[in-house]
Amino acid sequence: MSPGNTTVVTTTVRNATPSLALDAGTIERFLAHSHRRRYPTRTDVFRPGDPAGTLYYVISGSVSIIAEEDDDRELVLGYFGSGEFVGEMGLFIESDTREVILRTRTQCELAEISYERLQQLFQTSLSPDAPKILYAIGVQLSKRLLDTTRKASRLAFLDVTDRIVRTLHDLAKEPEAMSHPQGTQLRVSRQELARLVGCSREMAGRVLKKLQADGLLHARGKTVVLYGTR
């Protein structure tokens, strides 16, 4: 990602739903047929124009899905973590190339399997697991649709301060959030917060200062303690 890129309206990180109700045996059998790869932080796994033929499963770490405009602006469509599928639309809608960026947010281990190979396995060794895997993917797609609808409503009806407050409360429910004697401790930069709510970095900083003055949180550097959220 070039340093000059700017990021606009985004969805927030959602609660990861580990395995999406898939049992350990199903996951183990799925992973046995997949290729595991490790990626460093902030690595583009694929970009627009790359061949679209692979389903990804996040074993560990966190990734983002990003739409990129011609002027290098970026729209973060979502953050996804351990136990979630990425690139699942290709199982149902045929497309030759990718239209978005898959970028790691942390060090990640991903399981990768081609759509063609997975469809073959659904007819053979993964036949008993196929309904469970497809149902889990359907649940995931439904959650993402609901999340997108909720975020669109926030952008339409809430001001920046309200969006930041709600986003911080969303982040407080994430596995990365840490318990704190006064509430919940988050690690989020002003830039990342701006990307999550669709405002400038400067605006995000001003809102955090206001919320701190109002006694709702304490912010220092990338650390935010959100009071009363344990």
Curated annotation (Swiss-Prot):
GO-annotated cellular components: cytosol
Keywords: Activator, Allosteric enzyme, c-di-GMP, Cytoplasm, DNA-binding, Repressor, Transcription, Transcription regulation, Virulence
Pfam families in alphabetical order: cNMP_binding, Crp
Entry-linked Gene3D superfamilies: Jelly Rolls, Winged helix-like DNA-binding domain superfamily/Winged helix DNA-binding domain
HTH crp-type domain sequence ranges: 158-230
Function: Global transcriptional regulator that regulates virulence factors production by activating or repressing the expression of a large set of genes in diffusible signal factor (DSF) pathway.
Subunit structure as annotated in this protein's UniProt entry: Homodimer.
Recorded domain comment: Binding of c-di-GMP appears to trigger the active Clp conformation into an open form or inactive state, hence abolishing its DNA-binding ability.
Protein name: CRP-like protein Clp
